[in-house]
Regions:
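Cys/His-rich short segments
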Residues: 1-15
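Bulky hydrophobic/aromatic packing residues
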Residues: 6, 33, 38-40, 75-78
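DNA strand-break repair and replication-stress modules
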Residues: 7, 50-201
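Residue-level signal for pocket-adjacent positions within structured domains
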Residues: 8-10, 33, 43, 195
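A local structural micro-motif
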Residues: 16, 34-35, 86, 197
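Compact, charge-rich alpha-helical regulatory domains located at protein termini
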Residues: 20-21, 29-55
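Short C-terminal domain-edge/linker segments immediately following a structured domain
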Residues: 21-22, 97
Length: 201
């Protein structure tokens, strides 16, 4: 269940309306066995709306969020897969390197690509990606998903280097900023050409 919670998180595939307890029910009832099953829950509409604490309105809100997540970026997708040590920051780097193209990312793994050539990717992360891809149990979780979603490529929002002194610099945001969430701050830093980091090294 934890893998599904991780996948649905708002900072990953951003599927709202599915609490951990709801996912536990879906899994225990056999409605969700892999990530792709989340996109076929309409097959269980009647059973779901009859579930305690889950009426038609809750179902429609959940379904709307699921449908919205059918279009996602490569970095969202990778971050949601649960590859050890490969989260949002690594997902952004992979998204940029492979141009938002899942097939390019998968082909690189198949060809034995050395991910340590990428910024901030060490040997452990490189090994984790290759081990994850070779794990047949993991593949049974994510492979069915590929026919359910559409990858979208983010527009290059990075501003000109002439107007942003932060271009190319690693920036750690600490404290709070009015009207901005932490993710919002990171997205703004990316727009300014900076590389957001979670801690000072």
């Amino acid at each position: 269940v934890r893998k599904f919670v991780h996948f649905c998180d708002k900072t990953r595939m951003n599927i709202s309306g599915i609490a951990e307890s709801t996912l536990e029910t879906f899994v225990s009832n056999g409605w969700v066995k892999n990530f792709g099953d989340l996109y076929e829950l309409e097959q269980h509409h009647d059973e779901i709306v009859d579930t305690d604490g889950f009426g038609e309105k809750s179902y429609q809100r959940m379904q709307k969020s699921i449908d919205a997540s059918r279009k996602c970026t490569l970095n969202q997708f990778i971050a949601g897969l649960g590859i050890p040590m490969v989260g949002r920051s690594a997902g952004r780097i992979l998204n940029k390197h492979f141009g938002g193209d899942w097939n390019a990312f998968e082909d690189a793994i198949k060809s034995g690509f050395d991910f340590t050539v990428l910024k901030d990717f060490g040997e452990t992360m490189n090994n984790n990606i290759h081990k994850w891809y070779a794990d047949k149990d993991e593949e049974m979780l994510w492979r069915p998903l590929l026919t359910k979603i559409e990858f979208i490529k983010e527009e290059n929002k990075t501003m000109s280097t002439k107007v942003t002194p932060l271009y190319g610099k690693t920036v750690v945001a600490t404290g709070k900023l009015e009207n901005y969430t932490r993710d919002g701050i990171q997205n703004k830093l990316i727009e300014l050409g900076a590389v957001p980091a979670s801690s000072v090294t």
